Amino acid sequence: MRHFIYQDEKSHKFRAVEQQGNELHISWGKVGTKGQSQIKSFSDAAAAAKAELKLIAEKVKKGYVEQAKDNSLQPSQTVTGSLKVADLSTIIQEQPSFVAETRAPDKNTDAVLPWLAKDIAVVFPPEVVHTTLSHRRFPGVPVQQADKLPQLRRLACSVSQRDNKTATFDFSACSLEWQNTVAQAISQIDGLKTTQLPSPVMAVLTALEMKCTRYKVREDVMDQIVQEGGLEYATDVIIHLQQIDIEWDYANNVIIILPSGIAPSYLEQYSRFE
């Protein structure tokens, strides 16, 4: 049985999954409780194994962390990651497809949640009111729409080469999932960026732009991501931005990408995305 835990300020829950032949045994609930369980049957063992991988990929994407059987990392959990841009083909792996989870509607209430009711006022705490502006520069004035989205298209394009030195990227401290994401992002550096890229990949490119370029003002980047990809996509990018940090050895053009449990300092300039 493989166990996964999700924890944030509001919840602490588990998900466990195990394949037994052509069956998938699943359990979930709050940590410390028995939770609920379900058995799904498939046509054969291969189909069950594929479904297990999809379920695990979905939960990891949502922030679940697998719990090892002991406190030491398994051999398969470590990968050396000091690479030149040209060496990335050895690390990029096929991503498992994402399967959306469907939930039955809550039968205990037919009421609309108050913050979803039409035309209802949203009341903010006094300590954050000064940041809840419709636009960070001019309250009430919408962000100007760009025609060709130049900041987005050329995102992080100057990172791989600087002063005739090819950048070296070290992301070995990241999890396997993030190592794969970072490798995909680096492979896209010299191409034109669009919001068809997965949001974690876009987050890495945005982090590289903000941390490893000479120009620190990048407000237009997020405006253009929102314009093309929508607010939900941009929000997902911001969430993933807070999961990584970057250290840059400018003299040697070595870029180290690290996991981060809190919002890194380079996000401070974007504290008012709204």
UniProtKB/Swiss-Prot annotation:
This is Protein YehF. SMART domains: WGR. Has been implicated in selenate reduction; a mini-Tn10 insertion mutant in 'molR', (which was mapped to 47.3 centisomes i.e. this locus), is defective in the reduction of selenate. It comes from the Bacteria. The gene is yehF. PROSITE patterns: WGR. Gene3D superfamilies: WGR domain (2.20.140.10). Residues 2-78 form the WGR domain. Induction: Repressed by LexA, induced by DNA damage.
